[in-house]
Amino acid sequence: MPRNLVLFDLEWNIGYKPYIFNYHGVQQTFRGEIIEIGAVKIDEDANVLDTFSIHLRPRIFRTLQHHIAKVTGLTQADLDRGEPIVQGLRRFMQWCGPDAEFAEWGMDDVPVLKQNLFLCNLDESRPTQWYDLQQIFLREHPRKEGEGMTLESVVTRMGIPMERPFHDALSDTLYTADVCRKLDLRAGLAAYPTEEESLRASLCPAPGDYRDFRVFRGYVEQSTWRSDPKIITASCPVCGGDLQPDDIWLKKGNSGWDTLSACPACAGTGNEAGKGVFQRYKLARRDGLHWSFARCVQIPDEAGLARWERMRAQQIERMQARAEKAAAEADGKA
């Protein structure tokens, strides 16, 4: 059965003030309200089978923001003439079909789409499968120093004729299809990593002795990984007992956390968990609404333990300095 591949591009409006909404008890910031959708259905050779294009009339950010107007060339009149957003989004998802696999240039549009579907009381569970075509492109054409990854820069680099404007949703989607025809799209889709594979690669880079990798999905609260016992409680890789995390956690990049956890049963012994075990987490929110938490434990080597002790001491110093500064400021206001 042929795949139902949908390339799509969104243009969205933003407000002059943030818009906060409640998603199953958790406050989230609205990324933007969709004002234009362009999409094409393609086969696995990127041949265009069908197209879809629509302008939408927003309900929340009704005034066209000046930067959006400059980038897209749209006017307030274009927004006012658009199809009502609920009706238009429903029509788009029906055109896509329940088995659609979405693909976009980057990973910005799916979170925006899902937020808009939710705020329009439509089913935000779709799409369940989507692809970042930049990853597939980079697999065949590794990025060189100074090379941009905007759609326009890649179209130029691939020698594709520029016969349509950019920042028009349907036009950008057709350019994306042009780029895909320059690739081995079938192979790229087949090799595309799952969320679990991506999280494992990020959390468990070589070299390292990693154990008990797990992924916990579908959480709306980012802090759940620290409060849910089944996520925060890891098992000792030697005896299977519950590990006890250190009070100090070190942040790794934008969405990773590490600590050294102790196993009461193994502490002080000569086994590989005797000096503690690193407990590591990676947080991801690919769809803009739900968090996934990846966890593993790592058997430390001597260099890793020394690095941990040094960074832990530095973190404690920073915490103490912040506390002293806050106390001094409080005294000054008294």
Give names to the regions the model predicted.
Residues 88, 174, 255:
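Short Asp/Glu-rich motifs
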Residues 182-334:
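Acidic two-metal-ion nuclease catalytic site recognized across multiple nuclease folds
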Residues 31-37, 41-72, 93-219, 283-287:
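Metal-dependent phosphoesterase core characteristic of DEDDh/y 3'-5' exonuclease domains
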Residues 18, 80, 128, 165-166, ...:
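Short loop/turn and capping residues at structural boundaries
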Residues 2-111, 271-311, 317:
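Conserved non-catalytic scaffold segment of RNase H-like nuclease domains
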Residues 26, 75, 79, 100, ...:
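A general structural-boundary detector
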